[in-house]
Swiss-Prot record:
The lineage of its organism: Bacteria, Pseudomonadati, Pseudomonadota, Alphaproteobacteria, Hyphomicrobiales. Disulfide bonds: none annotated. Gene3D superfamilies: FAD/NAD(P)-binding domain. It holds the Pfam family Trp_halogenase. GO terms for cellular component: membrane. This is Uncharacterized protein y4xG. InterPro entries: FAD/NAD-bd_sf, Flavin-dep_Halogenase_NPB, Flavin_halogenase, Trp_halogen. It is a single-pass membrane protein. Its main location: membrane. SUPFAM superfamilies: FAD/NAD(P)-binding domain (SSF51905).
Amino acid sequence: MMLDLTNAKRIGIIGGGIVGWLAAIALRRVFDVDVDVTVIEAPTVFPLGPGEGGSLNLIDTLCRNELDLDVFIGEAGATHKLGVLYENWRGGGIPDRYYRMFGGSGIPEIECRVGGFFPLLSARIAAGENLHTCIPGFELITKKASQVEIDELLATGESGLYPSFHFNHAGFERYLRRVGLARGITSRRAVVHGMRLDDRGHVNAFQLGGEELEVDFAVDASGFARLGLGKVFNTRWCSFANVLPTDRAIIFELEPRGSSPVTRATAMKAGWMWEAPLNRSISAGYAFSSRYADAAMAIAEVENHYGFRVEAKHELSLDQGYFSTAWVNNFVALGTASGFVEPLEAALAAHTFEALRNLERILANGSGIVPARAIEGYNSANARCWTGVRDFLRLHYDSKRIDTPFWRDLAAAELPEGYANLRACFQKRTPRFIDIQPYVGSGWQSLFHEIDWISVAVPLGVVPQAAACAELRRLSTESRSEVQAYVDRLKGTIAKISSTRGYMH
């Protein structure tokens, strides 16, 4: 049955926070000015998940909602995020680090594509060269550039980088709330105890204790409370517990220690630790498996790592997975009310912003009249997107580390079928667009592209040098000559492409 919102009088949003206020601002633009948009600022717990690292679709989300970037930077204490630094994931000791940079335009290695792959990148892989050093802006990291220096290089358009930001959740929320109120959004502080449904299963009203607030369309941004899908509609939960190993986290702050435009992700004995540098502090946390450590053990390991005491601000249970259906009739859940994954790669933020973009797109393009098939398409694409997130995050744990029980058991664990199939392909060639196509559809965009997969799979050895050599041998003679010239410039050697053995040094 279609959803007809042409006569809607009120849009109700449960939960403030970043997700609730972003949804309110987006829907305020979609609906006519005489339609009331109300945010019920019920207490929420991490509606966008822990961690302060932005995703690549953050800036698009800000621009689409006409949010001033400079004001956001000031009020959210935002700092540039140009990629992720991974330490100790390969178990090779020091220095064991690699980067996933946010590569943009103007990079020959990324812009040169032949037959579905990137031959110049494959040449670097075959030659054993780092991938991140092909990005001109990587110098910003090596020289520990200031925010001003980063701004200056990005303004030239020659950095080869696409920026995002680390941000303070509370500051970002305050900014969104101020903008939302200025744009006529109504705010109420109340606790939502339940929802009244009509005989079609549509939400008619929020139950606020002694009163009801009637609504025509409802958004759940209540965070881990999950008032809609979890308590009213009893939607099936699709768990990632057998794929993604962490189920607990401690969250803490560190003193700032110089400029760093990357999120740091450090592999630990029973999980991994993140550091997101902000203006006045470093937001940090340790996501770990309760099978191998408890909170006290995690804090002790963190303190041993840094050499000073650390105070945990929060201890969280991480139930990773998603609800099989996010949009039910006139109700949709966003953020952690819809699903959750650990803060690795800021994947939850990326998914939330993409889900909101598609909700807005469907409502706007349909002029408030939404066919059932569009809702089905949204739910199907949402599920595919979550599966892509799961598989991309699982790639990060596909390590050769076996130095602790956590890593030994991971190395022996069964892989999900989809990722296992991709992994088999990556043993023979580099990741390609056809590999990630199954994760998108119905207007949704991919959260992680081929370059992202390559940037993680190659350093971990999931894509071996021999795989890059093999696909280079399949190039035409002309293309191979161009690649050979690139390699000669790259290494200043007489490395050759052999028709039988790949690269020779």
